[in-house]
Regions:
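Solvent-exposed loop/turn and edge beta-strand elements of beta-rich ligand-binding domains
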Residues: 1-307
Length: 307
């Protein structure tokens, strides 16, 4: 009995010696009896074990009586799926001048081993404001840095890879959704079982801004003196300086949305109040309007909006 073998190539994690781990068994398909009708070999009994060589061919030299049998893979290399198919074959009576018969199970076609494959899926969300994030692009890499694929999240913040061969990988963000900070972390995962699905939840921090508002005005700083025929004349001198005591309100000038599409502030809505000369709290990206609420003492309120 001889066979041919096909082993699916694993280009990401090659193993040229995979054939060395493969073992096949020959089993009886029915009870095998002696000339007296006594069962000598019960049905499904293992009769021989053999492997294949570097040409991916194998053969059994077991001296089997005329009967029905099947071939079954007992062991394959790590990273490949065991073929549990039973391949039937038979030895039948031949002319008396034929001493040995060679059969080829599976019609002489190669018996295949596929690589173990699994998947990785991601869910991407906004760590700052909540909500799913679309258009996050992640690369899938083997531990030696070879890119094995990529993922791009949809409007639900989701994507799933194509089949990945058994092995260790990591995810790394290539492009962050608009309005968020690129995540520099690597997220390792391992595919170890056939059709396994690894789920990874990922987040981005939204970009934010701060506003520093300073107020300048003229204050009396000195006086120039000059002699006149009527006495000393004083001319006030004014200098520009930063003024304290102003208070400002910051409004949304347009509807402001988070990167995940959540409405944070409607147009005209007050976001925060800040004192002049102080840095504002973190503000979401968007168009704002600054309006003076309280003028410094001794100055007229500035009613102009600053966009």
């Amino acid at each position: 009995m001889s066979l041919k073998k096909f082993i699916e190539e694993n280009t990401l994690f090659p193993n040229p010696d995979a054939y060395k781990d493969i073992r096949f068994g020959i089993f009886s398909s029915k009870d095998i009896q002696d000339n007296s009708g006594n069962t000598v070999i019960p049905k499904n009994s293992l009769l021989d074990i053999f492997g294949i060589d570097e040409t991916l061919q194998g053969s059994s030299s077991a001296d089997l009586p005329i009967s029905d049998y099947y071939l079954k893979e007992l062991q394959t290399a790590p990273g490949w799926v065991l073929d549990e198919t039973e391949y039937p074959f038979s030895f039948s009576a031949q002319p008396q001048d034929v001493q040995h018969v060679i059969v080829e199970p599976n019609g002489g076609q190669p018996i295949s081993n596929e690589t173990v494959k699994g998947y990785v899926e991601i869910y991407k969300s906004d760590a700052t404001y909540g909500g799913a994030l679309a258009n996050a692009v992640y690369g899938i890499y083997t531990t030696n840095g070879t890119q094995a694929g990529s993922l791009t999240t949809d409007l639900k913040g989701y994507d799933k890879s194509g089949p990945l061969p058994r092995g260790s990988y990591y995810l790394q963000e290539i492009s962050a959704p608009e309005g968020t900070v690129l995540d520099p972390k690597q997220y390792p995962f391992t595919i170890s079982e056939q059709d396994a699905v690894i789920t990874i939840h990922l987040e981005n921090i939204s970009q934010q801004a701060n506003v520093l508002i300073t107020k300048e005005g003229e204050r009396l700083t000195n006086a120039d003196q000059s002699e006149t025929e009527f006495g000393i004349q004083y001319t006030p001198v004014y200098g520009t300086e930063t003024l304290s005591g102003a208070v400002y309100e910051i409004y949304a000038n347009q509807d402001i949305y988070s990167p995940g599409g959540i409405l944070l502030y409607s147009a005209g809505e007050l976001i925060t109040t800040v004192n002049g000369g102080e840095i504002s709290p973190d503000l979401p990206l968007g168009q704002i309007r600054i309006q003076e609420k309280t003028a410094p003492e001794g100055f007229v309120l500035d009613t102009a909006p600053y966009i």
